[in-house]
A protein has these predicted regions:
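Oxyanion-binding/catalytic loops of NTP- or PPi-dependent enzymes
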Residues: 1-323
Length: 323
């Protein structure tokens, strides 16, 4: 029933907060031959920030409370506590939730039962840690906070430095201000509708905070608030969408969100200039696949000629941009 919820000209902001990542995108509702179509017009970075961060934040908060009571936890118990906090979080953020829930941290060794540590986590603690810590009110001009990094770091995934998802949302909409045909001088992309996805957003309080922050930004611009679209089961929507996409691709019919490549992709081309001491030749970026390039299409670069370096080690440089 999605056609009953949207209209031609709508810009839908999709906020997807899952277990380990946050993804943001903008989808335009278009009309073609009398039928409504969906086209993805902007995609944000794949932010490594999600429900796992929230579970760890709760676990470390409870661990500090236990340490103050003379009950320090080891690394194994902290991981077990994070799993217990995940279950408690989902219950305490739901409608009609109790004021607190018990949390049991198992011990290791022969005293598995008798040595277990019992505590509780309150609804107020969850609200303070998650809603205020990960979804704080902010201005649309705020950018994710960064800090000076240590010169040496362990190799691993590029986790987000700022845990505030609302600031990542503000940065995404600000970057995409020029991607939409909206009023000239708009400081950020202004969606007309909002769609949630991901198990984290099943919590009504988190959902309400995002709606409140986004519509606060829109009110400052003097535009109507974004309306919340009704979705299905938020933790199963991606799996169902993937299955439906396979169905559409196999049978060649059905509703498909047009969008193509999520980024523009470039290859580096070294400039042909005279040698200058201490200066490397400038690198130009040649676009190989523009944003939105559909699967199976080709782009001919007939007007370009390049020299290929052979017989020696070389380095191919590739770049991507979501702006």
């Amino acid at each position: 029933n999605w056609r009953k919820q949207v209209k031609h000209g709508d810009i839908i902001l999709v906020v997807d907060v899952g277990g380990g990542t946050t993804d943001l995108s903008l989808i335009a509702v278009l009309e073609r031959e009398g039928n409504l179509e969906l086209q993805r017009i902007a995609v944000g970075e794949h932010i490594l920030l999600g429900g796992d961060n929230m579970d760890l934040a709760l676990a470390y908060g409870v661990a500090r409370k236990l340490a103050a009571e003379g009950k320090p936890l080891d690394a194994w118990q902290t991981r077990a506590l994070a799993q217990a906090c995940r279950a408690a979080k989902e219950q305490l953020l739901s409608d009609g939730a109790p004021e607190s829930l018990p949390v049991v941290v198992p011990s290791r060794g022969s005293k598995l039962i008798g040595g277990s540590i019992r505590t509780e986590i309150t609804r107020a603690e969850v609200l303070q840690t998650l809603v205020e810590g990960f979804f704080p009110p902010c201005a649309v001009s705020d950018a994710p906070q960064t800090r000076a990094r240590s010169a040496l770091t362990q190799l691993g995934l590029p986790y987000a430095q700022d845990a505030a998802i609302t600031r990542h949302l503000a940065a995404f909409l600000t970057r995409q201000a020029g991607a939409l045909a909206q009023a000239e001088g708009a400081s950020f992309a202004r969606p007309t509708a909002l769609l949630f996805n991901g198990g984290v957003l099943k919590a009504p309080l988190i959902e309400q905070r995002i709606v409140q922050v986004l519509n606060g930004w829109l009110a400052q611009e003097g535009v109507p608030p974004a309306r919340l679209l009704e979705g299905a089961e938020l933790d199963l929507a991606v799996a169902r969408g993937a299955a439906y996409l396979g169905y559409v691709n196999t049978l060649g019919r059905g509703v498909r969100i047009r969008g193509g490549t999520a980024q523009s992709y470039y290859v580096g081309v070294e400039s042909n200039l005279p040698a200058i001491p201490g200066m490397e030749p400038p690198l130009c970026a040649l676009c190989l696949a523009p944003f939105g390039m559909e699967e199976g299409t080709e782009v001919a670069l007939d007007s370009q000629e390049f020299g290929l370096v052979v017989g020696e080690p070389v380095r191919l440089r590739f770049f991507g941009s979501s702006v």
